[in-house]
């Protein structure tokens, strides 16, 4: 089969209060597993890798991802007691890509999408029911949660608390 690119930063053994994320991108087939924060400190080298990993997979444009989005993902994994990687459908989206997806009639693409400001991500977990993922995100009351059962993903963002 095809080789899957893996990005792995060199790191010391993780501290007790470290926060880790494991992601696999369904479009680029890249995988990433790293500690992105220790205590109140975000690790710039790790957040830069996350920004690149969650780039617009159509244009390759890299946006700056809201650090709170990483924490939401980490908290969801804690709630679900799950160690498996999040499967990423969409992270950052350039305005041009967003307009193109809207023009193509792709469902659920908002004109002022928070994907364009690095404040939204569309994800799923292979072994976890989509409804459980949605419920865990809603439990946090930390932003928007969209449930797309047909498309098999949950949208999570750091905007106003709202559900659809």
Feature locations, PLM:
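Cleaved targeting-peptide boundary
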Residues: 11-18
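N-terminal export signals
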Residues: 1-11
